[in-house]
Amino acid sequence: MFVLFTAWNYQVTVLEILAVVASLIGVWLGTTGTRITWPWWIVSSSLYAVLFYNFELYASAILQFVFIVAAIWGWFGWGKDGAQPSKLAMKEKTIWFVISLISWLTLAPLLAQIGAAATWFDSFILVGSVVAQVLMVKEKYEAWPIWVVVNMVATFHYARQELRFTSLLYSVFIIIAIIGWRKWLKKAII
């Protein structure tokens, strides 16, 4: 990978910088509920798929393809007026939680079998992100608190994997997710 510069003994590649910038733009636009967020998700996810694969973070690489599919779904699902946030019923919250827990506990051992770099963290990020992304596409404000938790885990995880700028990005995502949570909660249709 082409190194753009070195910061704090860390080689920053062009690929990682482009992925970080595209991700920041896409996630910030998501807080506004505007449909233009989705093309940015496609660009950033394409870049991160390559980066994560190169670091043997296979679940994170696969997740990027899920994001691309969700971005296409979101583009058509949100329509020209953007997101109209609503809340999940308690039964729906319980179902999503159980599905998430079972998926995480099932996926981590499978990743270990194929030699992934960090199975439990990587699988948690994959499962949590898929759930949050689906809820975001479905315009549910509960997507944002899930993003807060996933981004906290991802910040720690990517720092341990020596992806420092990506770790920094996810720490910024925590703040953006809190902002998105507040904005969407105010607009949520009860």
Label the predicted regions:
Residues 1-32, 78-82, 90-145, 149-190:
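Polytopic alpha-helical membrane-helix bundles and their juxtamembrane interface segments
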Residues 39-43, 61-65, 145-149, 167-169:
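Hydrophobic alpha-helical membrane segments of integral membrane proteins
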Residues 21-50:
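Long, highly hydrophobic alpha-helical transmembrane signal-anchor segments
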Residues 41-78:
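Alpha-helical membrane segments and adjacent membrane-interface helices in multi-pass membrane proteins
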Residues 38, 57, 134-137:
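Alpha-helical interaction segments
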